Amino acid sequence: MKEKFLRELADIQTGPFGSQLHKEDYVADGTPIVTVEHLGNKMFSEQNLPRVSNTDKNRLKKYVLKQGDIVFSRVGSVDRCSYVDQKHDGWMFSGRCLRVRPTREIDSEYLYYYFCLEETKQFVRNIAVGATMPSINTKLLGEVVVTFPELEQQKRISGILSAIDSKIEVNQKINDNL
């Protein structure tokens, strides 16, 4: 097993600041923007997504998500995160979020599941600053120590966990229809 700081395994980016993107920039049809409210268990909630035009998307291209990215809440529930799958590739993330883009040294799904561990979530909550509203930034998140095996084993682990998540999702849909 290896150990490295997250900053050594991923590019960590804060979302656009308020001066870069305003509510007036939102359009009815366009590229969806993930906000803290849309972070769920692995997947994003797709309800009431703000959207921006292609012009704004091109202007703010460093905030465009790619498959394999992990999006974190920067304020409030700082231990919440979601995984960017193929369906959400090309979406954007808001200023109240942080985007983690893993290097090739670590499997992105393995890293996502690592952040789902209760001990990792607790560590993130503990490093947050702010008495009334906890918050994290790129520097603080980069201080998380990640323990990981060889890449092949990471992929096996994340494959098993992803298959379990898929079965849970199917069961939830069945239960919703009862």
What residues fall within each predicted segment?
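A short glycine-rich beta-alpha junction/loop motif
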Residues: 90-98, 106-109, 129-158
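Short glycine-enriched loops at secondary-structure junctions
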Residues: 39, 77-78, 129-130
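Non-catalytic DNA-recognition/assembly elements of restriction-modification systems
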Residues: 1-17, 143-177
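Sequence-specific dsDNA recognition surfaces
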Residues: 7-23, 37-67, 87
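A short beta-sheet element
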Residues: 35-36, 54-118
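A generic structural signal for short beta-strands and their flanking turns/coil linkers
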Residues: 30, 48, 94-96
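Specificity-determining recognition surfaces
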Residues: 23-25, 32, 117-146
